[in-house]
Amino acid sequence: MGTTKHSKLLILGSGPAGYTAAVYAARANLQPVLITGMEKGGQLTTTTEVENWPGDPNDLTGPLLMERMHEHATKFETEIIFDHINKVDLQNRPFRLNGDNGEYTCDALIIATGASARYLGLPSEEAFKGRGVSACATCDGFFYRNQKVAVIGGGNTAVEEALYLSNIASEVHLIHRRDGFRAEKILIKRLMDKVENGNIILHTNRTLEEVTGDQMGVTGVRLRDTQNSDNIESLDVAGLFVAIGHSPNTAIFEGQLELENGYIKVQSGIHGNATQTSIPGVFAAGDVMDHIYRQAITSAGTGCMAALDAERYLDGLADAK
C-alpha cells in the first residue's frame, strides 16, 4: 500500500459539493486533499444542458461545468487524487481511510460522495446491463442512433433522458408507473411537444415486467398495466434506459455514521455547524445528505457550508492545543 498520506482536511467526492468545499477550504489555507472517487465529476458529467446554473444561462453542459470547478479548485492548490475509498475508520483519531491506491489520514473529513443510479432489480435487467440496459443516455445514447429505445421513470431525469434520446433514436417509449409525471413544468412542456409533434410515445400506468433479448443484447421489453394486471404488452426496442432515481453512496459508512434511509444525517444548522454528522469532525455535503432538493446549486451550497464548518472545527482543535 505504501506510505500513509496525512492532511488536515480530506474531501471525498468530485461533484459540485466536493469541488466547492475544496475551493473554500483552500482559500482558508487548510491545504485540502480531494479524493475524486470512481466517477470523477459526479453525476453532472452525464448531463447535457445545464440551464439553471445562475450567471451562465447559455450553452453550459455538465462536463464543462465540472471542468471549470476542477480548474477552480486546482487554482487554489487543492491536491486532487484519483482514487476510490473502500474502507474507513472514523472511530479513532486521526480518521483513517483506505483506497485502491493508498492510505490516508485526516483531522477533519468532508463526505461528498454523492449518489448513484438506482435500478429496478429485475433479473432480466441485471442480465442485460451493458448490453442494452443503461442508466445514462448521454453516455450510451449514441449507440442507438435511428433505433427504438425505451426510458423508464417519471421525474426530471427520465424526461430529460427521453428528450435527449429523441434527437438520436427513431422512437423513444417513455414508461411510467403512474398517470402523471413529476418533472418540472418546463420539461413537461417540452415532453408534450415531442409527444404531439415528435417521436416520443408515452406508456403511463405501466411497470416493467421483463427485459427480453438474445446473445447480442436487448430486443424488447414487456410491460404490465397497473390498472389491469392481466394486460401485458410487448415493445420492440434495442435499448432500455432506467431513470428511476438514485441511491446515496454511503455503504462504507454504515455502522459508523448515523444514516436515515441510506442518507447521512446532519445537524439542523439552527446554531451553525449544519453539515456535521454524528461524529464531530466529519461533515457531509451534497446528494449524500440531501434526498429532497438534489440540485447542482444546492450541492455546491452545502459544500461551502461543510468547508466553513470544517474550518471552525479545525480552528477549535488548534486552540485546544
UniProtKB/Swiss-Prot annotation:
Source species: Escherichia coli (strain K12)
Cofactor binding note from Swiss-Prot or TrEMBL: Binds 1 FAD per subunit.
Enzyme Commission number, as recorded: 1.8.1.9
InterPro entries listed in its UniProt record: FAD/NAD-bd_sf, FAD/NAD-binding_dom, Ferredoxin-NADP_redctase_2, Pyr_nucl-diS_OxRdtase_2_AS, Thioredox_Rdtase
Cystine connections: C136-C139
Reaction(s) the record says it catalyses: [thioredoxin]-dithiol + NADP(+) = [thioredoxin]-disulfide + NADPH + H(+)
Name of the coding gene: trxB
BP GO terms, sorted: cell redox homeostasis; removal of superoxide radicals
GO MF terms held by the record: flavin adenine dinucleotide binding; thioredoxin-disulfide reductase (NADPH) activity
Keyword Acetylation: no
Lineage: superkingdom: Bacteria
Cellular component, GO annotation: cytosol; thioredoxin-disulfide reductase complex
Family per similarity comment: Belongs to the class-II pyridine nucleotide-disulfide oxidoreductase family.
Listed Gene3D superfamilies: FAD/NAD(P)-binding domain
Alphabetical keyword list: Cytoplasm, Disulfide bond, FAD, Flavoprotein, NADP, Oxidoreductase, Redox-active center
Protein's recorded name: Thioredoxin reductase
Compartments where found: Cytoplasm
Enzyme class: oxidoreductase
